[in-house]
Amino acid sequence: MLYEMKPLGCEPAKLTGLSEKLIFSHYENNYGGAVKRLNAITATLAELDMATAPVFTLNGLKREELIATNSMILHEVYFDSLGDGGSLDGALKTAIERDFGSVERWQAEFTAMGKALGGGSGWVLLTYSPRDGRLVNQWASDHAHTLAGGTPVLALDMYEHSYHMDYGAKAAAYVDAFMQNIHWQRAATRFAAAVRD
């Protein structure tokens, strides 16, 4: 299977506090790099003779495949989460209020988690857990750690490549800018699909 980059779903010039240069660099270099890396790993695995390949080679490739796959998927959720998508309402708002007590409580926790990752790396994810039938805020230290069985509804990339060009070490300002640019309709669509499945 050959993976392809999904088109950028937002208009970078219309985002508040995030430059076009930052968004295009992040999209092309980091997301695009993950897609290219996954295609290369997939091709290598397809050619690997499983009967004779050293187990450490297979293990290394499978680990890198997981990292590249999650990087690709999380970047797709991240970029799809950006834009002018109206306000939070409907079933997603109701679920956030049910699972966090209020939208303000959810936002305070999600934002604080992002700011705590400043200068580090990882993701902050609003994830639907089908096991528990609820939304959870999740910290993922890298591309290989996400909630098993969970579906990311909203993704905040906290690797330095996502903000350093615009904000330097001021990760907290980047988190605030991200929160102003959430495309709630797309997040609601992901939530509805996760609940249906």
Swiss-Prot record:
Coiled-coil parts of chain: none
MF GO annotations: metal ion binding; superoxide dismutase activity
Source organism, top-level taxon: Bacteria
Record Pfam families: Sod_Fe_C (PF02777)
Gene3D superfamilies, sorted: Iron/manganese superoxide dismutase, C-terminal domain (3.55.40.20)
Cofactor: Fe cation
This protein's UniProt keywords: Chromate resistance, Iron, Metal-binding, Oxidoreductase, Plasmid
Reaction equation(s) it catalyzes: 2 superoxide + 2 H(+) = H2O2 + O2
Protein EC: 1.15.1.1
InterPro entries: Fe/Mn_Superoxide_Dismutase (IPR050265), Mn/Fe_SOD (IPR001189), Mn/Fe_SOD_C (IPR019832), Mn/Fe_SOD_N_sf (IPR036324), SOD_C_sf (IPR036314)
Functional summary from the UniProt entry: Destroys superoxide anion radicals which are normally produced within the cells and which are toxic to biological systems.
Miscellaneous notes: This protein is not essential for chromate resistance, however it may contribute to resistance under certain environmental conditions.
Subunit structure comment from the entry: Homotetramer.
Family affiliation: Belongs to the iron/manganese superoxide dismutase family.
Protein name (record): Superoxide dismutase [Fe]
Gene name as annotated: chrC
